[in-house]
């Protein structure tokens, strides 16, 4: 049964021996062994036995040596995996060898030694009942069996008359590709972990992204974006010059300046740089309006030079005007305290000066009293109104007019609050004493003796 299953993979034939288990098949073969063999057919039977045995042994060795696929989708008796099927098959074959006198030992196993065939009687029975197609000893059969074995494919499930309870699945279409199983166990975990579809998809994506980056369409699109960004401020300038109040571009928002990587620039960085340059240009326009003749200059460097020259000229003009004001207003440097201390009363002789003024006042009063009494005695008819000469009165008036008035002193006092009252009284007494001395000198020029003049 196993021979037919392997040799006719994917082709359903009516089984020769329909037995529920392997033990019944063994009993039937043992019963056949006791029957006599026809000697006329012995040569042909043994030749067929040798050919079938060599083909079956090569197929079985390739089946055992080929690795089983890791992802098995069928289950045997509720237990998933192909190991169960292989164990049952090897056990059955071993039992067959034990029955015919070939035991599996260390040096003689069922894999290395040729397996014994059933007796000639059984071969005759199978020959007569079901004619099997003879297979030639093709050396590439083992490789094909290892690659496309009935256990690794889904054709094994298509057999409905098999004794194993296997879930039936739809057959494989011709358009689908068979998964190639790795021949060595070292590469099997790598093939199981890395699916072929994902790796090929990732490689294709990488190639597509590289081709898109290097394509001329991407380069042209980036250039168009840069040209649009450069043309935006130019449009704003043209609209401002023409006086159009409508804004062609929305006002930019305030962006945070982010430090970009080396050799790269982010969108926020470029926008923030553009906003900063626009603010600088606005301030330059304000300066351009303030500085006369700066509108004729083109370029920021020349504009800055003109502004610097204009500021320096303004500074020179301010210095010249300050010097002119200081030369015109001389009273600003006039120090009243220094003049009073030097000319009117020195600080060292201040007390002596007060004493001399008081002595002059007392002596003048005594002299005036004596002179008045003598005039009354000599000229009793002259009234008291004509005592003073009218010339003397005119001279005294002119002299008083030249003297500083009290208003002048009050102005100086208001300007200098630190001026003391004692100094003010001394100045007033000094003025009155001088007036009296002049009157005495003019009135008694003819009458006062010479010794009085010497004392004065």
Curated annotation (Swiss-Prot):
Domain bHLH residues, every copy: 264-314
The keyword Transcription is assigned to this record: yes
Pfam families (alphabetical): HLH
Superkingdom field: Eukaryota
Keyword Cell division appears in the UniProt entry: no
Annotated PROSITE patterns: BHLH (PS50888)
Polar residues bias (residue ranges): 159-185
Annotated stretches, region: Disordered: 159-254
Keywords: DNA-binding, Nucleus, Transcription, Transcription regulation
Localization annotation: Nucleus
Bias-annotated ranges (Basic and acidic residues): 223-254
Quaternary structure annotation from Swiss-Prot or TrEMBL: Homodimer.
The protein, known as: Transcription factor bHLH62
Record lineage: Eukaryota, Viridiplantae, Streptophyta, Embryophyta, Tracheophyta
